[in-house]
């Protein structure tokens, strides 16, 4: 029976791969659910700020893709400890490869920065790696 190789992982069969994938998705489910709720609350927060529908839509789509990236393509399990490189460089590279959209990296950076500021100000989730030390 042929082996299944994914990245640097090797599985004896497709069944083993699918079982491992299912277990991984199950383990990630709580973080994914939390991140999706926070993304929805972020969009509500943007509405409360009086931003235009177009701006809200763009930030909403960007943060939705960021959550997909975090929950499906990284091992992140806490928004307070996500590295700045994951938020900026790695997410931007992934976005360019996976999303058929000519999004400006500055737009993605603006969205993720607003999202992490929202988390800090409204949810008490402060990510020093992304926002820097408090008071700076």
Give the positions of each predicted feature:
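A conserved mid-domain beta-alpha-beta active-site/ligand-binding segment of alpha/beta enzyme cores
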Residues: 33
